[in-house]
Amino acid sequence: MAKKPSLSPEEMRREALETALSTIERKYGLGAVMKLSDEAHVAIPVIPTGSIGLDLALGVGGVPRGRVTEIYGPESSGKTTLTLHIIAEAQKRGGTAAFIDAEHALDVAYARRLGVNTEELLISQPDFGEQALDIADMLVRSAAVDLVVIDSVAALIPQAELEGSMGDTQVGGQARLMSHALRKLTGTIHKSRTAVIFINQIRMKIGTMGYGSPETTTGGNALKFYSSVRMDIRKIQTLKDKEEVYGSRTRVKIVKNKVAPPFREALFDILYGTGISRTGEIIDLGSDAGIIDKSGSWFAFGSERLGQGKENVRALLEENAPLREAIEAKLIEHLGMTPTKFASSGEEPANDEENDL
């Protein structure tokens, strides 16, 4: 009987690692462990975010279906604006979206300006946290809703706290509520392929004494653990025309990603009244990629001069849709953003190359 050739120590280590990785994937699913340089990501259906840069940073072309996503940041950082764009993208693809407005603060006119079909949007304004999460659970279980947004975790107040006296303390009530709800929701979300987005706020920790970040999110630790994607959104610059403020430069950092390598960032402009400026992104990303030639403050696309200054070019491209679409198509091709599968809620994703992006 021929002897099995002996393996070198390096080959034995590599074989042991491959065995461990395959065991982890069998137990916890594809994507539980990956290299930061991996290009082959988990093939799952997604809902685009409305931002080219953010879709690229997420690694799969948008917010994953059948998963929990958390979007958090300081006040007025663009959290609700981003989720309204995601709702609009879902509706464009024939999907059904629900917005659970626990804060009772949704601006319907603003949502409409961002492209949301408010007549088809399911809206709930629950009285307490248990009601909000129960409604979310029933919508997910129906397998007929593609996207559920809960705005926000901080407003999910337990019923016992609302019915108690003003001075009563309910220590950990919200954290227990979130932990119980997410244990119940997670399996159903995966089966129905519904994308569930929780909007969250930031609070300051007490007594950190300079060690670690002083910031934390509300609702305990359960949402951190159950989320497949966590996005930190921040306003980093105010956009002004002389003295008039017309928007903000916004950065989104992917602080957790179980479907692609994390820690990537996206930058885009949020313009007051109109939301994320896709045209602005085309200019920025196109210039970085060399598709748009930038010489000083002048911009050109091939032999065609676009204008001087980003705002002038933005105005030109907003008016000239064919030119904007030509630049965008070339940019998407350059970035290698492959077509994504949307897939209706409850539908198994097909293994084809259908272009729903």
Swiss-Prot record:
It is found in: Cytoplasm. One of its GO terms (biological process) is DNA repair. PROSITE patterns: RECA_1 (PS00321), RECA_2 (PS50162), RECA_3 (PS50163). The gene is recA. HAMAP family: RecA (MF_00268). Its main location: cytoplasm. It comes from the Bacteria. This is Protein RecA. Keywords: ATP-binding, Cytoplasm, DNA damage, DNA recombination, DNA repair, DNA-binding, Nucleotide-binding, SOS response. GO terms for molecular function: ATP binding; ATP hydrolysis activity; ATP-dependent DNA damage sensor activity; damaged DNA binding; single-stranded DNA binding. Can catalyze the hydrolysis of ATP in the presence of single-stranded DNA, the ATP-dependent uptake of single-stranded DNA by duplex DNA, and the ATP-dependent hybridization of homologous single-stranded DNAs. It interacts with LexA causing its activation and leading to its autocatalytic cleavage. ATP binds at residues 73-80. Pfam families: RecA (PF00154), RecA_C (PF21096).
